[in-house]
Curated annotation (Swiss-Prot):
One of its GO terms (biological process) is mismatch repair. The gene is mutL. GO terms for molecular function: ATP binding; ATP hydrolysis activity; ATP-dependent DNA damage sensor activity; mismatched DNA binding. The keyword DNA damage applies. The keyword Acetylation does not apply. SUPFAM superfamilies: ATPase domain of HSP90 chaperone/DNA topoisomerase II/histidine kinase, DNA mismatch repair protein MutL, Ribosomal protein S5 domain 2-like. InterPro entries: DNA_mismatch_repair_CS, DNA_mismatch_repair_MutL, DNA_mismatch_S5_2-like, HATPase_C_sf, MutL/Mlh/PMS, MutL/Mlh/Pms-like, MutL_C, MutL_C_dimsub. SMART domains: DNA_mis_repair (SM01340), MutL_C (SM00853). This protein is involved in the repair of mismatches in DNA. It is required for dam-dependent methyl-directed DNA mismatch repair. May act as a 'molecular matchmaker', a protein that promotes the formation of a stable complex between two or more DNA-binding proteins in an ATP-dependent manner without itself being part of a final effector complex. Belongs to the DNA mismatch repair MutL/HexB family. PROSITE patterns: DNA_MISMATCH_REPAIR_1. This is DNA mismatch repair protein MutL. Keywords: DNA damage, DNA repair.
């Protein structure tokens, strides 16, 4: 058996680096946190090659004398705590004394520093954790740390790094969180020769949000400030209209430390429980302030998670803070609050006049008006009116039976009595029977009309068929868009006026990595300075109403995408984008359809390779069999 022996310092530092330095973003986080602890007011971060080739952090903080600079490269050397009791009330971002020696152990490392009261600075060069040169050096007050060739001596770690764009996105996300947590500090982030973002450093959180997340998002945030016995919660929560497809826009800070906290996340999402559909997540920038001794920040190697002593009360504070903000903001469009606190509803005379003129589906527009996707003309099966058809131009009274209100009430009573008849249990309905190919079966269907302007009822060989018009159109659009993207032949609709879209630094880096997927899917876009994207064209048929949300949702999905080695990433992402675009472009429930529209929809669905489901796996067609109908009618 091998004898137990002490590891040499160099090996021990490389092992420690495995815990502290996971990727270039970890280096940036540790160095910027050191700068913040040094009371810096200006921080410049420069990277190259996604952080592999270069990471440089320059600050105007208090700097270090030569003795402290040398000591900083020793493990567990720190100015931030003295005893174990200090761990119970940590007020600094760093405290373990592991960051600099761990980073130096796996890189070509340079430290240049000067206190404000010293005339000369000091420079230390290290390679693989060993100091190779040091001495006086002319420099401005503050500290500059340069890290080159990260993991040059640990090639196994290099294999697990992602593309430069992905690593840059991770760095951008870390810096976004640190800059939001410290709006009084001016941050500048540069990748190569391009400036990614710059914050003003005025202490105004709204200005920092606008610089980092975009002006449009800053306009849609609601202020939050709530306090209970355990915590104070302040910052912003987003209106439900800007909810995202993932949680990448949830920023939580505990005592100014950017953290992941499941307790706060659950509390926030519970506050939005009845305001957002499944799969949509609220936006927030929330600062949680608790007594330092009531939160443990030493429970994770990277200090990314915390544990609250009064977890239940903190969750309650987050929940109440969000609920109060949402309650104070009138989420119903068109209402206003007068000076004396009275809620005023605007005059509906104009809407009544519009109703007399006839209803126009959302997005359809009127003759001569621009807009997005044109909705089909209104059509529905009706018992009244010539030919069983009622046009949208008829006044409201045309929908009442002859005899006025009394007849309407009698008709309502008859409908309620009819509702007592046992309904068909759709759980007992089946998908398309497999006695024939789905396409052939759909071609054999005879459309009867719309049900609730959402489903198409058809007579078919096995019984009554119901087709979800949205799911069916989704499948059609998906297969066309996906096939065209594979062949790089997607038809593009050029926009008369380009759309501008503000992205986060992480989203912009992800877009740059996946620009080819967007291009082959029909999106013509280019960077427009900073983190702004200029969109010149979209896939034909998509329209412009949902382009911004579609692009942001897809980028959010990619940001959270964990891809195993060897996975055909491009094709999978192409499918995801096609499915998301199809969902946005497809006709919706409650869209009225003309008979010719229904016939075209069925014909196109029958031609699909997989007409049974939409691209998300929901059925497009179900069948209520003849035997089930006979059973329900007691035949």
């Amino acid at each position: 058996m091998a004898r137990i022996r002490l590891l040499d310092e160099r090996t021990a530092n490389q092992i420690a680096a495995g815990e502290v330095v996971e990727r270039p973003a970890s280096v940036v986080k540790e160095l910027v946190e050191n700068a913040l602890d040094a009371q810096a007011k200006r921080i410049v971060v420069e990277v190259s090659g996604g952080g592999r080739e270069l990471v440089r952090v320059t600050d105007d903080g208090i700097g270090m004398v030569p003795e402290d600079a040398r000591l900083a490269l020793q493990r567990h050397a720190t100015s931030k705590i003295r005893t174990a009791e200090d761990l119970n009330a940590i007020t600094t971002l760093g405290f373990r004394g592991e960051a600099l020696p761990s980073i130096a152990a796996v890189s070509q490392f340079e430290l240049i520093t000067r206190p404000h009261d010293q005339l000369a600075g000091y420079r230390i060069l290290a390679e693989g954790g060993q100091i190779v040169a040091e001495g006086e050096h002319g420099c401005p007050a503050g500290t500059r740390v340069t890290v080159r060739d990260l993991f040059f001596n640990v090639p196994a770690r290099l294999k697990y790094l992602k593309t430069n764009a992905t690593e840059l996105a991770q760095i951008g996300d870390i810096l976004t969180r640190l800059a939001l947590a410290n709006p009084e500090v001016a941050f500048r982030f540069q990748s190569g020769q391009a400036q990614v973002f710059a914050t003003p450093g005025t202490g105004d959180l709204t200005a920092a949000v606008a610089a980092l997340l975009g002006r449009e998002m800053a306009k849609e945030l609601l202020p939050v400030d709530y306090r209970n016995d355990a915590a104070r919660v302040h910052g912003f929560v987003g209106r439900p209209t800007i909810a995202r497809a993932g949680r990448s826009h949830q920023y939580f800070f505990v005592n100014r430390r950017a953290v992941r906290t499941i307790a706060a996340r659950y509390a926030l999402e519970e506050a939005y429980a009845h305001l957002l559909p499944n799969g949509r997540y609220p936006v927030c920038i929330l600062f949680i302030e608790v007594e330092p001794h009531e939160v443990d920040v030493n429970v994770h190697p990277t200090k990314a998670e915390v544990r609250f002593q009064r977890d239940r009360e903190v969750r309650a504070a987050v929940y109440q803070a969000a609920r109060h903000a949402l309650g104070a903001a009138l989420l119903i469009p068109g209402t206003e609050v007068t000076a004396d606190g009275e809620v005023r509803v605007p005059d509906r005379a104009e809407e009544k006049a519009a109703l007399q003129r006839g209803w126009v589906p959302p997005g359809a527009g009127r003759p001569g008006e621009g807009g997005g996707r044109a909705a089909p003309p209104p059509w529905r099966v009706s018992a009244g009116g010539p030919g069983g058809q009622t046009t949208a131009r008829e006044p409201v009274q045309a929908y009442l039976p002859a005899g006025g209100l009394q007849a309407a009430l009698a008709q309502r009573a008859a409908e309620e009595a009819a509702a007592a008849v046992p309904a068909v249990d759709l759980a007992e309905a089946t998908l398309v029977p497999r006695s024939a190919e789905p396409g052939e079966l759909i071609r054999a269907l005879r459309p009867l009309g719309q049900v609730h302007r959402s489903y198409i009822a058809c007579d078919g060989p096995e019984g009554l068929y119901l087709i979800d018009q949205h799911a069916a159109h989704e499948r059609i659009f998906f297969e066309r868009l996906y096939a065209a993207a594979q062949e790089q032949a997607t038809a593009v609709q050029r926009l008369l006026f380009p759309l501008t879209l503000d992205l986060t630094p992480a989203q912009m880096a992800i877009w740059q990595e996946n620009a080819a997927i967007f291009a082959e899917s029909g999106f013509e876009a280019e960077p427009f300075g900073g983190n702004t994207l200029l969109i010149h064209g979209v896939p034909a048929g998509l329209g412009t109403d949902h382009v911004a949300r579609l692009v942001c949702d897809f980028l959010d999905r990619l940001q959270e995408d964990q891809v195993a080695p060897g996975t055909p990433v491009t094709d999978r992402r192409r499918r995801v984008l096609a499915a998301m675009a199809a969902c946005k472009a497809a006709i919706k429930a409650r869209d009225p359809l003309q008979p010719e529209d229904i016939a075209a929809l069925l014909s196109d669905l029958a031609a699909c390779a997989s007409p049974e489901t939409c691209p998300h796996g929901r059925p497009t067609v179900i069948c209520v069999s003849i035997s089930e109908l006979e059973k329900r009618f007691k035949r």
